[in-house]
Swiss-Prot record:
<feature type="region of interest" description="SR/KY domain">
    <location>
        <begin position="144"/>
        <end position="160"/>
    </location>
</feature>
<keyword id="KW-0805">Transcription regulation</keyword>
<dbReference type="GO" id="GO:0003700">
    <property type="term" value="F:DNA-binding transcription factor activity"/>
</dbReference>
<feature type="region of interest" description="Disordered">
    <location>
        <begin position="170"/>
        <end position="203"/>
    </location>
</feature>
<feature type="region of interest" description="BELL domain">
    <location>
        <begin position="200"/>
        <end position="271"/>
    </location>
</feature>
<protein>
    <recommendedName>
        <fullName>BEL1-like homeodomain protein 6</fullName>
    </recommendedName>
</protein>
<feature type="DNA-binding region" description="Homeobox">
    <location>
        <begin position="314"/>
        <end position="376"/>
    </location>
</feature>
<dbReference type="InterPro" id="IPR006563">
    <property type="entry name" value="POX_dom"/>
</dbReference>
<dbReference type="InterPro" id="IPR001356">
    <property type="entry name" value="HD"/>
</dbReference>
<comment type="similarity">
    <text>Belongs to the TALE/BELL homeobox family.</text>
</comment>
<comment type="subunit">
    <text>May form heterodimeric complexes with TALE/KNOX proteins. Interacts with OFP2, OFP4, and OFP5.</text>
</comment>
<keyword id="KW-0371">Homeobox</keyword>
<dbReference type="GO" id="GO:0000976">
    <property type="term" value="F:transcription cis-regulatory region binding"/>
</dbReference>
<keyword id="KW-0238">DNA-binding</keyword>
<dbReference type="Pfam" id="PF07526">
    <property type="entry name" value="POX"/>
</dbReference>
<feature type="compositionally biased region" description="Polar residues">
    <location>
        <begin position="176"/>
        <end position="197"/>
    </location>
</feature>
<keyword id="KW-0539">Nucleus</keyword>
Length: 532
């Protein structure tokens, strides 16, 4: 048995002392360590046999030594495979042998040659995640059953060759017939739309508005469907990964888009036909521009109508029409103030300007004529009447100034009359008892007055408007004083100067004598008495 010098050996000592060493030196040190381990294991077995140890301990020592050797070999292979994975040499998955030195054992070389490929593949997948997956995708795409359908969808949606061919064909047609647009414009100008009655035009306009609303509804529904499909696609992508929903949703989206496109094209064709009938699209070259302008007009009108018909909120009820609409309607009312009754064409025009309906416009004018127009007209007439009254009063003031002196003259005459009554009359045979006013004689609420027939009755203006009778002293047979009674109706007709001109009607006079004898005096008898 050979004796080896005892040396204190620590596994991995060389790696700790010098971290930067060559791979050949490391393998040589590993060989020395394995030999030393074998020697130490044999020495331990001898010591155990001397002390009468259990025979199973030999097997334990052998197992421990073999496990330690395998662990050291595994560490070496891991280092080699890590270096190969870092440099990218083992990406192809083939075996590769490295010459690490002249002292390498053949067993180690064979083990490394056998285990190199799988170790390299493991580290290749760890260092490049998705590398093999990309290769798998590249291999599976040509063999996929969805490839043909996807190619067809792409050809239908984006086909560069077909688009180029169509563009070239259109260019050739334009080059061959460059005067076609001019001819179409001439045809449209020379062939204006036939005369259409007002009712037919209104019907066509209503159809046009309905078709435009249908077109907007189709666009809105398609946008809604597209948004819902996008939500479904995003949910698929979150659960199954990016692009998982394309095979399921692309075909459905394409089919629905075709359906909406065909429906939209049909509605657009009907709209173009109606516009041509109405004469809105007159120029063929500017057809797109005219269509865009008419479209903008329709959108503007639609927005105004939506503002007009906008449903008010429950807590803030809408009162009346919008302010802009009311201003337009008021302007028209004041422009046509003398005749504020719009025609049907005026109502349609105002409805377009205000964004209201024809019924709303007519109702507003009905209310405005009652609430605005009629009070204003009444105020105007009232002002005119007040001006006329003021002018008439200013004209009547000088007449009253002329009447003033006449009344003064009457007062002077009355004074003279009273003075003459107090004087004795020598020219007549009447006594003083028949002169002047008779006081104290009242009969049935009537007042009597005895006046000589030669005197003018000028002082009657002082009497009131009650029942009044006049007694005139007349010469009659029997030599008695007779009086004539006058009723109040006859007296009421006397005023100022008229008393001298108007004759007393005979049927309203009575002949009264002091003996309570009454006889009606006819007009002829009165004349006879006055003459006598």
């Amino acid at each position: 048995m050979e004796n080896y010098p005892e040396t204190q050996f620590i596994p991995g000592d060389s790696m700790i002392q010098n971290a930067i060493v060559s791979y050949s030196e490391e393998s040589a040190g590993r060989e020395r360590r394995t030999e030393a381990n074998n020697v130490s294991a044999s020495q331990e077995r001898q010591a155990l046999s001397r002390f009468g140890g259990v025979p199973q301990m030999q097997n334990i020592g052998q197992d421990f030594g073999s496990w330690r050797d395998q662990a050291s070999d595994r560490n070496g292979f891991q280092l080699m495979s890590a270096m190969a994975g870092a440099t990218g040499i083992l990406q192809t998955g083939q075996g590769l042998s490295l010459s690490l030195g002249s002292q390498i054992l053949p067993g180690i070389h064979q083990i490394s040659h056998q285990n190199m490929a799988p170790r390299g593949n493991e580290y290749a997948t760890q260092s490049f995640p998705g590398g093999n997956q990309n290769l798998d995708v590249v291999r599976t795409i040509p063999n996929s059953k969805y490839l043909k359908a996807a190619q067809q969808l792409l050809d239908e949606a984006v086909n560069v060759k077909k688009a180029l061919k169509q563009f070239q064909a259109e260019g050739d047609k334009n080059n061959e017939n460059p005067q076609e647009p001019n001819q179409s414009t001439q045809d449209s100008s020379t062939n204006p739309p036939a005369d259409i009655s007002q009712s037919e035009r209104q019907e066509m306009q209503s159809k046009l508005t309905k078709l435009l609303s249908m077109l907007d509804e189709v666009d809105r529904r398609y946008k809604q469907y597209y948004q819902q499909m996008q939500i479904v696609v995003s949910s698929f992508d979150v659960i199954a990964g990016y692009g998982a929903a394309k095979p399921y949703t692309a075909l459905a989206l394409q089919t629905i888009s075709r359906h909406f496109r065909s429906l939209r094209d049909a509605i657009s064709g009907q709209i173009l036909v109606l516009r041509k009938c109405l004469g809105e699209q007159q120029d063929g070259s500017d057809g797109k521009r005219v269509g865009i302008i008419s479209r903008l007009k329709y959108v503007d009108q639609h927005l105004r109508q939506q503002r007009g018909f906008m449903q008010p909120q429950a807590w803030r009820p809408q009162r009346g029409l919008p302010e802009n609409s009311v201003l337009i309607l008021r302007a028209w009312l004041f422009e046509h103030f003398l005749h504020p009754y719009p025609k049907d064409s005026d109502k349609i025009m105002l409805a377009r300007q205000t964004g209201l309906s024809r019924g709303q416009v007519s109702n507003w004018f009905i209310n405005a004529r009652v609430r605005l127009w009629k009070p204003m007209v009444e105020e105007i007439y009232k002002e005119e009447f007040t001006e006329n009254d003021s002018n008439s009063s200013s004209e009547n003031t000088p007449k009253m100034s002329e009447i003033g002196p006449v009344a003064a003259d009457d007062e002077d005459r009355a004074r003279e009359f009273s003075q003459d009554q107090t004087k004795p009359d020598h020219g007549h045979g009447y006594g003083e008892e028949t002169r002047g006013m008779v006081q104290g004689s009242h009969m049935d609420g009537r007042r009597f007055m005895a006046v000589e027939p030669t005197y003018h009755v000028a002082d009657t203006s002082r009497l009131g408007r009650g029942d009044v009778s006049l007694t005139l002293g007349l010469q009659n047979s029997q030599g008695q004083d007779n009086v004539v009674a006058m009723s109040s109706e006859a007296y009421n007709n006397f005023s100022g100067v008229d008393i001298y001109e108007n004759a007393i009607p005979g049927d309203e006079m009575e002949y009264v004598n002091p003996g309570s004898r009454q006889n009606r005096i006819n007009s002829s008898q009165l004349v006879h008495d006055f003459v006598a």
